[in-house]
Amino acid sequence: MSNVTTLLDAKSVPEAKAALVCPSRNETYSYKKLRDEMNRIGFGLLSLGVKKGDRVCICLDSSPEYLISYFALWRIGAVAVPTNIIYKGEELLHVINDAGAIAVITDRQGAGVIRSIRKDAPALTHIICCGGACDGTLAWESFPPAPENMRAANCSTADLCHIQYTAGTTGKPKGAMLTHGNWMTALDTERDALRLTPVDTYLGIYPMGHVGLSWGLAVIRAGGTYVMMERFDLEHYLALAEQYEVTILAGMPPVIHSLVHAAPGTEQRLKHARVIISGGGGLLPVVWEGFDKRYHIPVANSYGLSETIVIGSGTTTLPEYPQLTKNYQSVGVAVGYTELKIVDTADPEKELPFGENGEVAIRGPAVAGGYWNLPDATREVFRQDGWFLTGDIGNLDAEGILCITDRKKDMIIMSGWKIYPTEVENVIIRHPAVADVAVFGVPDERKGEFPVAAVVLRPGAALTGAEFEAYCRNHMAGYKVPRNLIIVDSLPRVHGWKLLRRDLRQKFGGSRS
């Protein structure tokens, strides 16, 4: 049987051991309690008529109920469709209708939004509400215990279990179709890449509606303990790392940046950590180098997408690749059974030589089967030979080490020159007045496009256009220098880290002042 939830049936893990800890609610789920809750909710869904292959949306904040919902749906062979409690009605309606969801699991806040759009969601039959029922919903707490003999649905590796809607950085979200086989491969790969064991404790901060959840599931797959945070707060993060003697830290670029600039003595508070994971966006070399020199904790700078359940490559500190720990530009080597290659952006059939920039392509058993209800979009990037075109620009060296340069859609072409925004940002972020930066292209009748920089200044700092231009010209070729400096209070990011250059182009695309 290939049902991914069989990871909770392992006899090698003591049933009383903590699998999931939610410190904000002072709740601990042992492996037995987590399995019992999974079966209870799964059995309740079966009693409502949810069957194998049916799609069910999860609309919750990160919580034990979110994780249990995944497991319960997978247990009965249904398909989890994760969303986020911050979605507005129109965003939720798109996902619910596109997926054809027959039920939604939410809380009292989300129930109000869903009830307001229910009339426009013809397939939606049930709203299950955590925290007590309200009008038109069923209470999560009302489902009775499952029979003792309840077992996982018989699923194959090819059976769909998850539709992960992309963040929509290039338009309307697309649903990546993920299977039990995809998930089992990803969890085993992540477990092996980080050499996870039952003694590991993981501090997770990735939103549970995001495939970054897989790191927490990989720790459970290894028999360890997953300590969850609903949202990042530096002091709380450090306190939990100390209290639970955390060995595996979840990090995103903003988290690692915060740690670089944290108070003296913070190093001691992370003394149990043996690795920190970075994912979900590019980690600037200056930030990585600063973290490395201060903490001496290896950074697993991972690369992947919704379409690959995170897994593509990673700078895991394997003995055979010691150089990864000091290559601050790299996202490492292909992990597990994943294959990587670089192809021509105009002709994906043409593989490029080592060191040359092109589109990153990934092939392997964790790669999604395509996009839900979008055959044309599927054919465009999921090739018949199994290669997935990521839309990211990068290069491979002779040792198989991957460096991501930029997004294909973000590349700026000015008078025939190719400008990679991330490369320019890596220079600008080193300016002492700059806290955050985004470089993007705007149309120009004569040159096609030209680069613009939106900059967030450090508190109390100032930066004039002339100073900015002089700095850039001293550190990069003239054609790469942004033609305009825009000072902003913040940059648009998904989940707090993935940059939405599209929003900047829409807002400032006509500005040259």
Residue ranges of model-derived segments:
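Conserved AMP-binding/adenylation subdomain of ANL enzymes
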Residues: 184-201, 208-248, 262
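Conserved beta-loop-beta connector loops within the AMP-binding
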Residues: 337-361, 380, 398-399, 461-465, ...
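ANL superfamily adenylate-forming
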Residues: 24, 109-157, 262
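Gly/Ser/Thr-rich phosphate-binding loop
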Residues: 221, 246-250, 260-326, 339, ...
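Conserved AMP-binding A3 loop
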Residues: 28-32, 161-185
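AMP-binding/adenylate-forming catalytic core of the ANL superfamily
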Residues: 87, 93, 104, 249, ...
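Conserved pre-ATP/AMP-binding loop-to-beta segment of ANL
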Residues: 16-18, 129, 145-165, 172, ...
